[in-house]
């Protein structure tokens, strides 16, 4: 496919390997590694593990990008289900919507953190004012 981005790979999750019989050779709860040494979570772990199948020089970058995307989706809370259920087409509007959902989740997290910091600043201001008032009264 020239002129377009593609990612050939597989997604390994607990659902895919959890019901295979022991004779299938699936090792459970064992940390593995790829050919180039990157760690691979066990197939029954709670994290998603991505593996590329092509042999292009961009494999490492594609795997790193896929891992970062998986970590972002897992950290998004309830937005994760929206993104995970969306289609994986290369439609620009779908990709833009996915990026927007990620940005909205990050904005919500930052807004919550800002609220917490504002409360801490208000408490420190009150403590400082009471300490100054106590010092002046002595």
UniProtKB/Swiss-Prot annotation:
Record's keyword terms, sorted: Capsid decoration protein, Capsid protein, Coiled coil, Host nucleus, Host-virus interaction, Virion, Virus entry into host cell
InterPro entries named in the record: Hexon_assoc_IX (IPR005641)
Inducing factors: Expressed in the intermediate phase of the viral replicative cycle.
Pfam families documented for this protein: Adeno_PIX (PF03955)
Disulphide bonds in the chain: none
Gene Ontology biological process terms, A to Z: symbiont entry into host cell
Record-level GO cellular component terms: host cell nucleus; viral capsid, decoration
Subcellular localization(s) per the UniProt record: Virion; Host nucleus
Stretches assigned to coiled coil: 100-127
Keyword Kinase: no
An annotated Gene Ontology molecular function: hexon binding
Domain comment as written in the entry: Three N-terminal domains of hexon-interlacing protein form triskelions between hexon capsomers.
Quaternary assembly: Homotrimer. Interacts with hexon protein; this interaction tethers the hexons together. Self-interacts with adjacent proteins. Interacts with kinesin light chain KLC1; this interaction leads to capsid disruption at the nuclear pore complex during virus entry into host cell.
Purpose of the protein: Structural component of the virion that acts as a cement protein on the capsid exterior and forms triskelion structures consisting of three molecules that stabilize three hexon trimers at the center of each icosahedral facet and fixes the peripentonal hexons. Dispensable for assembly. During virus entry, recruits the anterograde motor kinesin-1 to the capsid docked at the nuclear pore complex thereby subjecting the docked capsid to a pulling force.
Record-given protein name: Hexon-interlacing protein
Species whose genome carries this gene: Human adenovirus B serotype 3
